[in-house]
Regions:
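Extracellular, disulfide-bonded carbohydrate-recognition/adhesion ectodomains
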Residues: 2-8, 19-154
Length: 154
């Protein structure tokens, strides 16, 4: 338990040190697609690790996509097309306990058969745009594209 808390604190401090506190962005990114009051921006020509994708989304005032239900999963799959994209899910801090990077409850799941594998180091979540199914993988095993979500501020 102490180890998980220490990892969480270390992660938070590292993120703040590397990127600082970001100012709210008022306008959605160009070419963003709206869904349920949020804006989704795909970077399908940019391969990155999960951490690189997370920080790139942070830098534009967004986050890696968090999927709350089947309708949103299908929406994201259609944007992803034939690409494999990073989602904001991880079990890095406690193996087998999946959480969304933004703190949302990890209720909806759409795992591919045999997933999550639970293999050592497979702590990051990807979505296959062909099927909409999820898989766990390592941060460096697969360089995937990213899809950033920006919450609409009212």
């Amino acid at each position: 338990m102490k180890n998980n808390l220490l990892k969480t604190i270390l992660f938070s401090l590292t993120a703040l040190a590397c990127h600082g506190l970001l100012a709210d962005k008022v306008e959605p990114a160009k070419d963003a697609v709206a869904f349920r009051g949020n804006h989704y921006k795909a970077f399908l020509d940019t391969n990155s690790t999960w951490w690189e994708a997370k920080f790139a989304c942070d830098d534009i005032g967004g986050e890696l996509v968090v999927i709350s239900d089947a309708l949103e999963n299908e929406f994201v799959r259609r944007i992803a097309k034939d690409h494999v994209i990073w989602l904001g899910g991880t079990d890095e801090f406690e193996e087998g306990t999946w959480t969304w990077d933004n703190g949302d409850d990890f209720k909806f799941k759409h795992w591919n058969e045999g997933q999550p594998s639970g293999a050592s180091g497979h702590n990051f979540l990807v979505l296959d745009g062909k099927t909409g199914k999820w898989a766990d993988t390592t941060d460096f095993y697969r360089k995937s594209e990213r899809l950033c979500l920006r919450m609409e501020r009212h």
